[in-house]
Amino acid sequence: MKVVIVGGVAGGASSAARIRRLDEHAQIIMIERSGYVSYANCGLPYYVGGVIKEQEELTLQTPESFWDRFRIDVRVRQEVTAINPAEKTVTVRALDSGKSYTETYDKLLLAPGAKPTVPALSGVDSERVFTLRTVEDTLRIRRFVEDQKPKTAVLAGGGFIGLEMAENLVEMGVSVTIVQRPKQLLAPLDTDMASFVHAEMRRHGVALRLGETVTRFRQDGDSVLTLLEESEPLRSDMVLLAIGVTPDTHLAKEAGLELGIRGSIAVNERMETSVPDIYAVGDAVEVTHFVTGQKALISLAGPANKQGRIAADNICGGNSHFHGSQGSSVLKLFSLTAASTGINEKAAQAAGIAYDRVVLFPASHATYYPGAQSMAMKVLYEKESLRLLGAQIVGGEGVDKRIDVLATAIRAKMTALELTELDLSYAPPYSSAKDPVNMAGFMIEDLESGKVRQFHWNEVEDLPCDGNATLLDVRTEGEYRRGHLNGFRNIPLDDLREHLDELDRGKPVYVNCQTGLRSYLACRLLTQYGFTCAHLSGGYSFYQVVTQEQQTARSAYPCGMEKL
């Protein structure tokens, strides 16, 4: 059997190695147009920033190591320019010599990946405008940074690569501005959770120009101007385009393969395309979203590697299936970690799913053990079935652990109530006896059993401020003085029983505390004394962070934030 693989990196390289493990006698040819066949593309921003010191540390395999260990024929700096499915051949052009040749195949695997989205704007070809996708891109940026020593940079786009590059440039002393049309960074997060990311970026001096449209770029001497639709131009020493990626599928289209959403390659669960004996994996293919069942593009290394393995199994006569991806991801930003899995509120609404959510602020480990760090956790679940839909966590230590537990729970199709039963490891330096994941389950259990009701930060503006409801803040007097929601009366939780006669049982009570725990306790107390009660999900801390990121909207709130 002769297998030709178009593209290396994650999907192609993992598939090649798997084929060899399954079939020692197969002829395997891997064709890669760049000079690097298998490298850690997720580490590229950290090489630019000097966190990863040596270029060799990014290299996972070389053509020589592939041959020595696997007897795989790797051809770098060569590009497949055409596929002939009828004759089962590919046309290959050697980039250095310009010469072309034809290669036959029995099985063909396409792993072309995705290319940076470059807008059709004037000035994008400036020598000071960069994209980051390959090792060659990385070397070009690093040479520029070392030689030119830029003081300012504009990043067009606020996705994973853009934010990681922003952090690394800031650590190198570069003043960074992020500009993008969407009004929030990190699309997998909901707006409220993204507010924590915005605050962290601003805390480290990153200027955010969100909701703005770039119209063109213009080089002006040793700087480049980023022209905006409704604002003054931004002058900087360099620009990085990090708008996103587009599936690189021109070969598949020209060969007559069926295409999916946004021009991606359509494949089945066996990673087979619409043409016999042609498989496809990685960022170029559409996948089924594990939660919604809808087609999606999920450009992540984890799914690409799994798809490569599955395609290899099937190429070698197996029957393996890829059951979709839920887009689990994690990102380091200065002292913050942001992670998500499954779907967010926007995606749930688009899919027509009736859902609810809980917000909590657990600690990374037992608070009596030194070094505990807080995290904001949001868990979404379907109302009727109680199945888990997604989770988002932003904080310090322990975020990655909890998102992985929740990702596993989603994959296992657990209900939200089953989170209460998870038997997770505990010792004071690592967790609490009731892990944050357990706590999320407990909260959902209380909501669904009717033991407590909640309202959310974006509903504060709708609270009745005309005396038809009791607005109650159960934090300490000192906490209340440092900042509170306008119209809320302060009765500390520990004193609440002594003040019950001052409250009108005929009016609904809306309770607020710092993170949602004391307000929950207050609601349980009040409910048992005949009051109708709801508490603010996430508490004042959550409300404060979110509304500080939405100052214009906040100023219109009749029950907005009042600072004394």
Please provide the spans of the model-predicted regions.
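Rhodanese-like catalytic fold shared by cysteine-dependent sulfurtransferases
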Residues: L417-P428, S432-A469, E477-Y510, Q514-L564
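Mid-to-C-terminal Rossmann-like scaffold of FAD/NAD(P)H-dependent oxidoreductases
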Residues: M1, A284-E397, P428-S432, P436-D462, ...
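A Rossmann-like FAD-binding core segment of flavoenzymes
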Residues: H25-Q27, R69, R75-D96, E103, ...
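Beta1-alpha1 glycine-rich phosphate/pyrophosphate-binding loop at the start
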Residues: M1-R77, A166-L189, S328, K401, ...
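Rossmann-like dinucleotide-binding cores of NAD(P)H-dependent redox enzymes
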Residues: T59, T152-A153, F160-R218, I298-A304, ...
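Short hydrophobic core segments
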Residues: V6, E103-G113, A156, L234-G244, ...
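FAD-site-proximal beta/loop scaffold in flavoenzymes
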Residues: D125-K149, P233-D313, V405, A409
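Glycine-rich dinucleotide-binding loop and its adjacent helix/turn
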Residues: L110-M172, A207, I261, V267-E269, ...
